Amino acid sequence: MQKIQFILGILAAASSSATLAYDGKITFNGKVVDQTCSVTTESKNLTVKLPTVSANSLASSGKVVGLTPFTILLEGCNTPAVTGAQNVNAYFEPNANTDYTTGNLTNTASSGASNVQIQLLNADGVKAIKLGQAAAAQSVDTVAINDANVTLRYNAQYYATGVATAGDVTSTVNYTIAYQ
């Protein structure tokens, strides 16, 4: 009897796999390029000092103030003909400070200002960078690799999520250099 149950079990297992059928196929494509640029020493760990502003200037949700430019300097960039990469930008990595709803950085200062975040923007100071998104959806402008040195220009500003209160504002974000 045990022999029959064993054989029936084997037959059942074999026949169940025969009923599986593929519903589709996924193909993955990518490209690996030489690292075409190096971040300069002074750009590796930046500190961007935002201006001191009045809490009144951030009196309601969506208000922004204190637009402050910053740059990431790259050196030793190879030409696109050598590497296959023609453009470069910073990809701002999501972390514990990322507000996935607004796409901004939350304030991590102890006893800091409330209802205040830090918003990153492209060089134009208008188009917001949406943190917490995939690279293509972050809306980060790319820069052509035309020279051995490339400057990536961005901006940061205060962003109100409600009526702001006074206090310090601090946050951090890591970045990776991405090539296209």
Swiss-Prot record:
Alphabetical list of InterPro entries matching this protein: Adhesion_dom_fimbrial_sf, Adhesion_dom_sf, Bact_Fimbrial_Adh_Pro, FimA-like
Main location group: other
Signal peptide: 1-21
Cystine crosslinks: 37-77
Subcellular location: Fimbrium
Key words, A-Z: Disulfide bond, Fimbrium, Signal
Gene3D superfamilies assigned to the protein according to its UniProt record, in alphabetical order: Fimbrial-type adhesion domain (2.60.40.1090)
Keyword Membrane: no
Pfam family, one: FimA
SUPFAM superfamilies: Bacterial adhesins
Gene Ontology, cellular component aspect: pilus
The keyword Disulfide bond is assigned to this record: yes
Gene Ontology terms: biological process: cell adhesion involved in single-species biofilm formation
Family as reported in the entry's similarity comment: Belongs to the fimbrial protein family.
Job of this protein: Fimbriae (also called pili), polar filaments radiating from the surface of the bacterium to a length of 0.5-1.5 micrometers and numbering 100-300 per cell, enable bacteria to colonize the epithelium of specific host organs.
UniProt protein name: F17 fimbrial protein
Organism, as annotated: Escherichia coli
Gene name as annotated: F17a-A
